[in-house]
Curated annotation (Swiss-Prot):
Highly expressed in testis, moderately in pancreas and weakly in other tissues studied. This is Ran-binding protein 17. May function as a nuclear transport receptor. It is found in: Cytoplasm; Nucleus; Nucleus, Nuclear pore complex. It holds the Pfam family IBN_N. Belongs to the exportin family. The gene is RANBP17. The modification N-acetylalanine is found at residue 2. The lineage of its organism: Eukaryota, Metazoa, Chordata, Craniata, Vertebrata. Binds to nucleoporins and the GTP-bound form of Ran. GO terms for molecular function: GTP binding; nuclear export signal receptor activity; small GTPase binding.
Length: 1088
């Protein structure tokens, strides 16, 4: 396609459409034109035209974007050209320092990319792209604007060096990053600190925007230096509180100088909030410095300086009124405890005063509950870890936590109770609605609350009694929900959550009988509240209290009910006196009564039903508890009366959202586990249990073919599919599963088949049915190993085949779908079908050979449906949607293992699609997918190798098999690049990547090498010749060692030998490629 834009005016119109245009069509066209411009031979000249003569900043931004994409290509531009681009941009920004900030940023990113990708490039024995540091120093000697540009260059370069590009070998990135760390990063940090000292030494005019910008950029540069991934650990940022900064040993001198920390504390106190929070961010990293950087005296001194800084900030807290400063300071405090032990903290001279200040700061923060809950997380983390460390402190110095921890607990409790009235009266967002944050904070509080537990318990008892009495007064007489009742219910909800929290905080190795007795005192009150609330149903009810009660019951279950329960626990002493609950059997009765009550009265409140059923499910896991549960009357009632009449959530009325039906699977899983305890081979008992479902199915059968009540039928079928999936999941024995199969076949399975055919375009209906079929196909615990006289395995597969074929054929009639519709409407169903098919193929309960033998086409049909669905999915979607990739690739592994005749008889375009999907899957980060790809490739390569090895030796009776193998061989000969590309990918993975499944990679690689020895020799030569002369012989020896003792066959013994050699090879090559970045270059651009 020829370029349509030649003049500057046309290019600027393109920029307008691309960056500020509102017409979507024009923007898409502009994006296409941009890609065309990048591929054009005139790209550089057009970029130069835009930069030098463009009239808008967007023209300059387009030029920078094009240059960035151009220099980032896998096939790099010549060294001279990249040097010219770098020098041109440096001169350009030097001559125009007042460019728009986003243009300067984009141009500097181009310089950073060029520098990183060319870090090891050599001309005339010099690393030509490392001169950037010297170039930047020229900027620093100019005006303030030039100085800012110089700092941004260093900052962007540091960030770029730290940025992992997943499209390139990770080993190459680590090599560049490590070299930059060792040769330049320390100098950059020293330079940045010296600039800050210079700025701080002069009177700072904060009204001067340029000076403010300079300080901001220098602080960002320091932060980028300290955030550098020094050892390639790629720490998960979500685990922020666990971070340790692995500062290199060569930086010790910088960190040992007290002036370094003083500088950043002084900057915090001197700068406005936008800048001071950057200074605090730097201090967070300083506080996170690895312990091993210092010896013991040095560490104590360094900690002392940090504590002094904390004290100074808390004594002058004005800056903490800014949310950014407040958040960073909370992180700073949490990092102190992460990296220093309580025994070290108490030895600091200022510790008593500082812990008092921190306690007061925490109490104030908790009292302002509406302010920055994300920051409070770090404060609670600090106190949680401090209190958790108390049993292990050996120091004689007082830690004072027994004084301050109860105050923190009290502040949390009282502040949450006080918040309720404000939330209700001012109609604010209720913190209790954000359950993720509430649970996280409660989990932290449970440790703190156990310090001086007597005080916590006394406070909670007093508050609970007071609020429960007030609530009872408001209920009698009951005159409807009032503001006062709502407030009281909110306070009780918090108290129940808090009681559950402290009970759940019991630790076996630190608990005492007195503490258990206190847990009993608190638990009594919640059990009494349960009775009070349940007697008022359905007239008065409160969802928040119910959710809190379920939280408490679950915490009590984890702590005091279970297989390892201490029967002598004092928790039951007080409960026995007040409630008559003497042991865990009585508690289980209370649990089950509560569950039945909730399921009966809370049918319209999905959160309560869902949490109740999850609690029931948790109770039903564990044989000892199950034996106790089945003796309880409430359980017997559930097993005989699981209908919508008793449990409204099982109804199909329009009041229930279809998404609410999901909880029915959980209900029937738990219920079936309870049934299984005493079921044995009692078919009558099973039939009685299934009676409500039988009635429902018979109703559906009667009205399915009529045109009325179709919506009701659909909802009934969705509910039934979810119910049966829960039942099937829990039936893990052959006897019980056979009962279910006999109940479903042949009457009800065809009904589900018809539903899929009728409502194939409605995933709310098809997804539950397909998931049920996928569950039925699972041979878990060998439950599908039917008796030898039983045809059930084949009958089940035939039904699955019909359903998959029906769905697969119908879903393709939907045509093209939008990006947001393609997964829910199509790909999700396909992934479930593939999962079901994989379970059938790998289940070992069907002899697939009999289908062809007896002229049954169900097996062939389902394989053809697999192909049709596959060809309707793009390769990118296969890998983009995780559930789809994790069902397709294991299925393909089964097919290549046991059904190679199907694979080799595929039409060439289909076979090419399958092999391409394997090739692309080899490089994915998902080890499940990449391992399946390796295994599938190994089966294909092994088949091909054996065919070639036996060519010409086959007797006449095997001619058909030979012809099938010949077809595959012919395809590979027509497309030699397919296997060559995969060999290249696997070699690249072994040599350059962090290979997490080395054994899997090694298996197909041997076959590929034996089939393509010539191409392997080319790859070997490519790698060896790309290295400096001193390394070439070392690498050549590595390759010789790789094939040493390896024979020309694929026997298990030979494969194992190759796998062992490959492990040594990988280690030796990594050692050979590892070089001192100061001395010699090493190109790692071998294979793409």
């Amino acid at each position: 396609m020829a370029l349509h834009f030649q003049s500057l005016a046309e290019l600027e119109v393109l920029c307008t459409h691309l960056y500020i245009g509102t017409d979507l069509t024009q923007r898409i066209e502009a994006e296409k034109a941009l890609l065309e411009l990048i591929d054009s031979p005139e790209c550089l000249s057009k970029c130069q035209l835009l930069l030098e003569q463009g009239t808008t900043s967007y023209a300059q931004l387009l030029a920078a974007t094009c240059l960035s994409k151009l220099v980032s290509r896998v096939s790099p531009l010549p060294v001279e050209q990249r040097m010219d681009i770098r020098n041109y941009i440096l001169n350009y920004v030097a001559s125009q320092p007042k460019l728009a900030p986003f243009v300067i940023q984009a141009l500097i990113q181009v310089i950073a990319k060029i520098t990183k990708l060319g870090w090891f490039e050599v001309q005339k024995d010099q690393f030509v792209f490392r001169e950037i540091i010297a170039d930047v120093k020229k900027f620093l000697q100019g005006t303030v604007e030039h100085c800012i540009i110089g700092v941004i260059i260093l900052s962007e370069l540091t960030q770029e060096m730290n940025l992992v590009d997943y499209s390139r070998p990770s080993a190459k990135h680590r090599k560049i990053a490590t070299s930059f760390r060792d040769t330049s990063l320390k100098d950059v940090l020293v330079l940045a600190c010296s600039l800050l000292k210079e700025v701080f030494a002069k009177p700072l005019n904060l009204q001067d925007q340029c000076q403010q910008n300079l300080v901001m950029q220098v602080l960002k540069l320091v932060l980028n230096c300290l955030n550098f991934d020094f050892i390639g650990s790629s720490a998960d940022e979500s685990a922020d509180d666990l971070c340790t900064v692995q500062i290199p040993t060569t930086w010790r001198t910088i960190f040992l100088e007290p002036e370094t920390l003083d500088l950043f504390f002084n900057l915090y106190h001197s700068l406005p909030p936008l800048l001071s929070q950057l200074a605090l961010s730097c201090l967070v990293q300083f506080a996170s410095t690895r312990r091993s950087l210092f010896n013991s005296p040095e560490r104590a001194k360094y900690l002392g300086n940090l504590i002094k800084g904390v004290k100074r900030i808390l004594e002058n807290p004005q800056g903490l009124s800014d949310p950014g400063n407040y958040h960073e300071f909370c992180r700073f405090l949490a990092r102190l405890k992460t990296n220093y032990q309580l025994g070290e903290l108490v030895m600091v001279k200022e510790y008593p005063e500082v812990i008092r200040l921190i306690a007061n700061f925490t109490i104030t923060s908790l009292q302002h509950w509406e302010f920055a809950p994300n920051s409070v997380h770090y404060l609670l983390t600090l106190w949680q870890r401090m209190v958790a460390s108390v049993p292990f402190v050996k120091s004689t110095e007082p830690h004072l936590l027994d004084t301050y921890a109860p105050e923190i607990t009290k502040a949390f409790i009282t502040s949450r109770l006080d918040s309720v009235a404000i939330v209700v009266r001012d109609h604010l967002d209720d913190p209790l609605d954000d359950t993720a944050t509430v649970f996280q904070q409660l989990e932290q509080l449970c440790t703190v609350s156990r310090c001086e537990y007597e005080k916590t318990c006394a406070l909670l008892v007093q508050l609970f009694d007071q609020n429960a009495q007030n609530y009872q007064k408001l209920l009698h007489p009951y005159s409807g929900v009032t503001v006062d009742i709502t407030i009281q219910e909110g306070r009780l909800a918090w108290l129940v959550y808090l009681v559950g929290t402290v009970v759940g905080g019991r630790l076996t190795y630190t608990s005492t009988d007195e503490h258990d007795a206190m847990d009993g005192e608190l638990s009594c009150r919640v059990f009494q509240l349960i009775s009070l609330m349940d007697t008022g149903l359905p007239r008065c009810c409160n969802e928040k209290i119910e959710l809190a009660i379920l939280w408490f019951l679950d915490q009590f279950r984890k702590t005091y009910v279970g297989d390892q329960l201490q029967r002598t626990s004092k928790v039951y002493a007080r409960m026995s006196e007040v409630l008559g609950i003497t042991d865990d059997n009585h508690v289980l009765e209370t649990f089950m009564t509560k569950i039945v009550t909730n399921l009966k009265y809370w049918g319209r409140y999905e959160p309560v039903i869902s949490r109740t059923l999850q609690f029931l499910n948790d109770l039903s896991v564990g044989y000892i508890l199950l034996k106790k549960l089945v003796k309880i009357d409430a359980v017997k009632f559930m097993l005989k009366n699981h209908t919508s009449e008793h449990f409204p959530f099982l109804g199909i009325s329009d009041n229930h959202s279809l998404s609410d039906f999901r909880c029915r699977t959980t209900f029937y899983t738990a219920l079936t586990r309870l049934l299984m305890v005493d079921l044995g081979e009692d078919e009558d008992e099973f039939e009685n249990f299934m009676l409500p479902l039988t009635v429902a199915f018979e109703t559906v059968l009667q009205i399915f073919n009529n045109n009325f009540k179709q919506e009701d039928v659909k909802r009934m079928l969705i509910g039934l599919a979810r119910d049966l999936r829960g039942i099937a999941f829990a039936l893990n024995t052959k006897t019980s599963y056979t009962m279910l199969f006999d109940w479903m076949y042949p009457t009800y399975l065809p009904l589900l088949q018809n539903a899929v055919e009728r409502w194939y375009g409605e995933p709310t209906c098809t997804t539950p049915i397909l998931k049920l079929m996928a569950e039925l196909m699972q041979n878990r615990s060998q439950r599908l190993n039917f008796d030898v006289s039983s045809p059930n395995g084949i009958l089940l597969f035939r039904e699955a085949s019909k359903m998959v074929c029906t769905y697969g054929n119908q879903i393709l009639s939907l045509g093209s779908l939008s990006k947001d519709q393609i997964y829910p409407m199509k790909l999700k169903g396909i992934s479930i079908c593939y999962s079901a098919l994989k379970s059938a193929l790998c289940g070992n309960y069907v002899s697939f050979g009999v289908f062809k033998l007896y002229g049954d086409n169900h097996f062939d049909n389902v394989l053809q449906a697999f192909v049709k669905m596959l060809l309707s999915v793009s390769h990118s979607d296969l890998l983009q949607y995780r559930k789809l990739s994790q069902s397709y690739y294991p299925l393909l592994e089964c097919l290549t293992q046991d059904h190679m005749s199907f694979i080799i008889n595929l039409e060439p375009p289909v076979l090419m699609y399958v092999l391409t999907s394997i090739s692309e899957g080899l490089t994915t980060l998902d080890t499940v997918v990449s391992s399946s790809c390796c295994t599938s490739l190994d089966y294909i390569v092994t088949y091909l190798f054996k065919h070639i090895a036996k060519e010409g030796k086959k007797p006449l009776r095997c001619r058909e098999a030979t012809q099938a193998g010949q077809r595959l061989l012919h395809f590979m000969q027509q497309n030699p690049d397919v296997l060559q590309q995969m060999m290249s990918v696997l070699m690249n993975t072994i040599v350059f990547e962090d290979c997490r499944n080395q054994w899997s990679v090694s298996r197909p690689l041997l076959g590929l090498i034996l089939l393509n020895e010539k191409y392997f020799s080319e790859l070997r030569a490519s790698l060896i010749n790309s290295q400096p002369l001193p390394k070439q012989e070392v690498l050549a020896q590595c390759f010789r060692n790789l094939m040493e003792g390896v024979e020309q066959n694929l026997s298990v013994k030979n494969r194992d030998r190759f796998t062992q050699n490959l492990s040594v090879f990988r280690r030796d090559v990594a050692e050979a490629l590892r070089s001192d970045g100061n001395t010699e270059p090493c190109s790692l651009d071998m294979m793409s």
